């Protein structure tokens, strides 16, 4: 096992570079993601026997240097499969926790442990326990965008692409408590038609901020475009309304996870696509299909927590071996069961 201890010697004049890193509440600054930085990151990664994973919403420089880029669940499964015993997870904290849950014997690092998630924080273990007490016997279905403690109290996890399948796998007569995303939960209720699905009123502040008016305006201004909408978006209902009212062709309105967006982008015949999700996703979409004009429905939809994983944070992480992610063994075992139950029903799909 590769153990990350202490300061690792730096190449060339990178000592000066790391000395210039400044800390602030919004992340580690002072380092440019240039070729010198990239060369040093690759060297340190090899030296430490590490694999760097980056979420689709990360800064372009972080995505470019990563060994793998994807959604949180796909990356966590990769973490469990790769031979390297040190995982550097460039994402928000619950994602690194999920990687640790699925790889309990590996060292998992996150470049900045302060990178939280408004959606994961929207339900606490105590709140979930109280909700379960109000609905004895109900099945708890939790989105993978939850903390380890919430996963441990969950019967079965789901992703944005398989949430409907997961809920439909549960006895129709049994109540379902769906948490924490209200918009994904509303999507599940709408598609399944189940009235006994109760939805927690949590949200991702970035996706919730992509509103229906913006989407309607963009759709009407670009009648020749296809529309990709993430189910966490507050505008997902507006997208379906546009299709239902005939204002936008139904076959051009797609409610998709980030992984689903990449697949659809590679297969579409349209040359313009409006995208309703965190703006970091456009970088991966443009790489996957450079001939398509991808446009953000809201170009201000940027997650400040995702962007805390800066070039300086990643360099610091590999030099100092920080910040390591720990999950209590009993919580990890219970959380792992809820994820495995999801995988066992098939179609695990994309994490977000």
Curated annotation (Swiss-Prot):
Pathway annotation from the record: Cofactor biosynthesis; NAD(+) biosynthesis; quinolinate from iminoaspartate: step 1/1
One Gene Ontology cellular component annotation held by this UniProt entry: cytosol
InterPro entries cross-referenced by the UniProt entry: NadA, NadA_sf, Quinolinate_synth_type2
One of the GO BP terms on file: 'de novo' NAD biosynthetic process from L-aspartate
Molecular function via GO: 4 iron, 4 sulfur cluster binding; metal ion binding; quinolinate synthetase A activity
Binding site for iminosuccinate: 55, 72, 143-145, 160, 230-232, 258
Catalytic activity line of the entry: iminosuccinate + dihydroxyacetone phosphate = quinolinate + phosphate + 2 H2O + H(+)
Keyword Transferase: yes
Cofactor annotation: [4Fe-4S] cluster
Documented EC number(s): 2.5.1.72
Binding site for [4Fe-4S] cluster: 117, 204, 303
Protein's cellular compartments: Cytoplasm
Keywords of this entry: 4Fe-4S, Cytoplasm, Iron, Iron-sulfur, Metal-binding, Pyridine nucleotide biosynthesis, Transferase
PANTHER family reported in the protein's UniProt record: QUINOLINATE SYNTHASE, CHLOROPLASTIC, QUINOLINATE SYNTHETASE A
Role this protein plays: Catalyzes the condensation of iminoaspartate with dihydroxyacetone phosphate to form quinolinate.
Protein name per its UniProtKB record: Quinolinate synthase
Biological source species: Mycobacterium leprae (strain TN)
Gene of this entry: nadA
């Amino acid at each position: 096992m590769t153990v990350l201890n202490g300061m690792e010697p730096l190449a060339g004049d990178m000592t000066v570079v790391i000395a210039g890193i400044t800390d602030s509440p919004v992340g580690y600054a002072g380092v440019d993601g240039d070729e010198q930085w990239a060369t040093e990151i690759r060297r340190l990664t090899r030296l430490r026997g590490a694999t760097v994973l980056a979420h689709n919403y990360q800064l372009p420089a972080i995505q470019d240097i990563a060994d793998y880029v994807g959604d949180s669940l796909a990356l966590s499964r990769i973490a469990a499969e790769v031979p390297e015993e040190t995982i550097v997870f460039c994402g928000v904290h619950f994602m690194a926790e999920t990687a640790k849950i699925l790889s309990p014997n590996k060292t998992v690092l996150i470049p900045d442990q302060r990178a939280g998630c408004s959606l994961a924080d929207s339900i606490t273990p105590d709140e979930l326990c109280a909700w379960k007490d109000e609905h004895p016997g109900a099945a708890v279905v939790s989105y993978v965008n939850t903390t380890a403690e919430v996963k441990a109290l969950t019967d079965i996890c789901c992703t944005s692409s398989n949430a409907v399948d997961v809920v439909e796998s549960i006895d129709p007569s049994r109540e379902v408590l769906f948490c924490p995303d209200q918009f994904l939960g509303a999507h599940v209720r709408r598609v399944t038609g189940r009235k006994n699905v109760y939805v927690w009123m949590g949200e991702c502040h970035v996706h919730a901020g992509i509103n229906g008016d913006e989407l309607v305006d963009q759709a009407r201004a670009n009648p020749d475009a296809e529309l990709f909408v993430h189910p966490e978006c507050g505008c997902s209902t507006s997208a379906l309304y546009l299709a239902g009212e005939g204002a936008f062709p139904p076959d051009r309105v797609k409610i998709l996870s980030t992984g689903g967006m990449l697949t659809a982008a590679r297969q579409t015949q349209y040359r313009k696509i409006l995208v309703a999700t965190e703006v970091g996703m456009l970088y991966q979409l443009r790489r996957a299909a450079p001939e398509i004009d991808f446009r953000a429905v809201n170009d201000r939809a940027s997650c400040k927590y995702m962007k805390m994983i800066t070039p300086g944070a990643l360099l610091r992480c590999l030099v100092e071996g920080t910040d390591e992610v720990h999950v209590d063994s009993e919580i990890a075992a219970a959380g792992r069961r809820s994820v495995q139950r999801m995988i066992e029903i098939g179609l695990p799909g994309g994490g977000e």
